[in-house]
Amino acid sequence: MKADLPSRRILNTVLPGILVVMWSTGFIGAKFGLPYAEPATFLAYRFTVVAVILVVVAFLMRAPWPKSAKAYFHLFIVGLLLQAVNLGCVFFAIDFGVDASVTALINGLQPALVAIIAISVLGERTSGWQWLGFVLGLGGVAMVVWRKLELGVGTPLGMSLSVCALLGLSIGVIYQKKFCEDMDLRTGTAMQTAAAAVAMWIVSAGWETGVVDWTGEFIFAFVWLSVVLSLGAIILLLYLIRCGQAARVSSLFFLVPPVAAIFSYFMFNETFGAVAMIGMLVAVIGVGLVNRNP
């Protein structure tokens, strides 16, 4: 047992970083697969597969299900915000030409925005450092967005969708903390994903052709996003929470945008000029300040 302790410590040190890298690939996978399927159709298939797997896992593990209609309602709202609105807007933004790294950067403001929203909604206290971090994060993102639009990379609509994705994610996190804090992660996530799947099928049926080109590239992106990322990241996150590593994961999530930018550079040749790089650095520092321990 004692011999296993150093290995466990090393594992618990490395795994949060692995989770951050996995999370970063979500934006890359979206851009990789979108040439072969429309955004809502892509997500409809993805959410359906993930929801079915999660429901099966929940039944096999005999996980407790919500006991009231109100509990289901709250789970559905969170699913729509965290998955349908957030990921839906991310996918549509990338489809409108926004760099994957830029969508990751804007989404990366979530801890800062949640900290500010939590003041009025949850009554949580926010320090001066967190306010400074929020201002720096917002300013850094504004620099990147302005520079990218000036260079003709992306469109105002695409950038607006990225902001909508951030709002959906941030409001969803607050809503879940207020109304779904006691949910079972297995059944709760299954219901949230099912709600997002229904929403995406409605969008797909109403505004898209529903055609998917099942190429090798698309299948790889689909399997990666649906199984490796959606399920693997959830399992890894649950393990880290059980091991008491949730705080470390939260403190490292501000690294998602630069990691996504590195992936984007090598896979799609997405580049950052001097102004955009400074903006990303300022934004990352800002989110890091929001996450710092008081």
Label each residue range with its predicted role.
Residues V14, I18, A44-V49, I77, ...:
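Hydrophobic residues within alpha-helical transmembrane segments
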Residues L54, I117, T126-K148, L166, ...:
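Hydrophobic transmembrane alpha-helices of multi-pass small-molecule transport proteins
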Residues S24, I28, V55, G79-A84, ...:
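Hydrophobic/small/kink-forming positions within alpha-helical transmembrane segments
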Residues E38-V50, I94-Q110, T155-L167, E217-V227:
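Structural signature of hydrophobic alpha-helical transmembrane segments
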Residues M1-I18, A51-V78, F91-F96, S120-L132, ...:
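Membrane-interface interhelical linkers
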Residues M22, G29, V49, L81-L82, ...:
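Hydrophobic residues within membrane-embedded alpha-helical segments of Major Facilitator Superfamily
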Residues V21-V52, I171-A196, T209, W214-G216:
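Juxtamembrane helix-loop-helix junctions in multi-pass membrane proteins
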Residues L43-Y45, V102-L109, Y175-V198, S230-F266:
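Helix-helix packing/entry segments at the starts of transmembrane helices
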